[in-house]
Amino acid sequence: MSINNISAPRFDWTHAEIKALFDLPFMDLMFRAQTVHRENFAPNEVQVSTLLSIKTGACPEDCKYCPQSGHYNTELEKEKLMEVQKVLEEAALAKEKGASRFCMGAAWKHPSEKDFPYVLEMIKGVKSLGLESCVTLGSLNDDQAKRLSEVGLDYYNHNLDTSAEFYDSIITTRTYQDRLDTLSRVRDSGIKLCCGGIMGMGEEQKDRVGLLRQLSQMTPHPESVPINMLVKVEGTPLENVDDLDTFEFIRTIAVARILMPKSHVRLSAGRQGMNEQTQALCFMAGANSIFYGEKLLTTGNPEADKDMALFANLGINPEKREEHSDAAVAEAIAAQVVKQEESKLFYEASV
């Protein structure tokens, strides 16, 4: 493969071609990935997102990596659906700290009709602050995808997690095809996709190849591709799984960048366990998005000040979006306070 034609998006990557990329000498792979990255993105900019759990715990799914699953005893305290006003206050704080995208996650198999209107209000409020909006709510039906699109949702996160072949070893309560069907509904509704996977769950390299191949065959590619390192949580079935080699994780990011040259590749969960040198290599490999803040749903994340210090050392700047004045932010939150006074926005939403 010529270095001169590797940046054009393709949707027909074979398993053998992707395996060959993984097998390149590390420096050659890094050079190729960085070349693709520079052809498509500002090389020293990273998109910064903040992730908030708007409803925590008691999830009926049995994902073996997840502390929010109701199947495992992780001593995680379940929490009710957050008030819309509180969510918008968190969004405003995230923007103040430099985030350009605000992601909201709910531990559901799928959203109920009781819960859904409140999530729609959260999305509208986040967008009124000048932030990109993203939610992860589980499986969606056609009507729910349409309603999310109508309120202007920018991104829907629904990860494939791993290869189709390894998937049943990790999750049994939702099929791989279920996930693909939700992704199709989201795409058909005009919402951008945030879709990636988790590395270090005991999978083999062929499974990382299979996951990236599946993602790269989506037309168009997911606009955002989170690459997570497993965060081991006591009480989950994967708490004692062997660690993934750090260089293999970096290779996975580099291959993702080559396969999906126009996508934001997010260095996602697991950063708290990485030193600055490892994170720098991930950025060199083509990662150009992170989650910013001390917590990702229920797991730890590097402190915001440490991230900004790392950015300064590397000469990296956060991507910028259109600025909204402080008055506009206050007005958006105040509008939600009025709505809250007119309806009950805080209730049990544990399943």
Curated annotation (Swiss-Prot):
Record carries keyword Metal-binding: yes
EC number: 2.8.1.6
Domain Radical SAM core: 44-271
UniProt pathway: Cofactor biosynthesis; biotin biosynthesis; biotin from 7,8-diaminononanoate: step 2/2
Keyword vocabulary terms for this entry: 2Fe-2S, 4Fe-4S, Biotin biosynthesis, Iron, Iron-sulfur, Metal-binding, S-adenosyl-L-methionine, Transferase
One GO MF term: iron ion binding
Source organism superkingdom: Bacteria
Cofactor: [4Fe-4S] cluster; [2Fe-2S] cluster
Catalytic reactions of this protein: (4R,5S)-dethiobiotin + (sulfur carrier)-SH + 2 reduced [2Fe-2S]-[ferredoxin] + 2 S-adenosyl-L-methionine = (sulfur carrier)-H + biotin + 2 5'-deoxyadenosine + 2 L-methionine + 2 oxidized [2Fe-2S]-[ferredoxin]
UniProt-listed GO biological process terms: biotin biosynthetic process
SUPFAM superfamilies: Radical SAM enzymes
Record's cofactor remark: Binds 1 [4Fe-4S] cluster. The cluster is coordinated with 3 cysteines and an exchangeable S-adenosyl-L-methionine.
Subunit structure: Homodimer.
UniProt-listed HAMAP family: BioB (MF_01694)
Name the UniProt record assigns to this protein: Biotin synthase
Native source organism of the sequence: Marinomonas sp. (strain MWYL1)
Upper classification of the organism: Bacteria, Pseudomonadati, Pseudomonadota, Gammaproteobacteria, Oceanospirillales
